[in-house]
Amino acid sequence: MLSLLYYLVVIAVALVLYVASFIALVVCYPFDRKRVVVHTLSKWITDTIFGLPPFMKREVIGIENIDPKKAYVMTLNHNSMADIITIYNLPLVFKWVSKKEVYRIPIVGRLLYAHGDIVINRASAKEAMQLVHERGKEWLAKGAS
């Protein structure tokens, strides 16, 4: 019963913040080119969804070494959803690089588009690397990691 309640809360929170993200994107886009507002809403989504289960604890060591005024290029060895939870605890606005298949997931895919994340087609490594390089430079120039 508890897991059913958890999933209902997750769905409700995700839907509310999903709608809020798109409203924020439309309203804030002219003056929020880094998409900080949409990023903040996504942080709330992960904090809420992954903060509900009492057995999930988070600890980020070394966070004091990150300068929020700088842009970083980060590489994650994505082994689990814990990577996503952890990176949203960093004091940075960042963009994901994700395979195009992830964008087909309801709600999640639309949020990634709202973020301005980088979509790659893994069928062509050369094109994917070129896209990451071009779009990555654009976002780094705007101050996003």
Whereabouts are the PLM-identified features?
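Soluble catalytic domains of membrane acyltransferases
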Residues: K57-S145
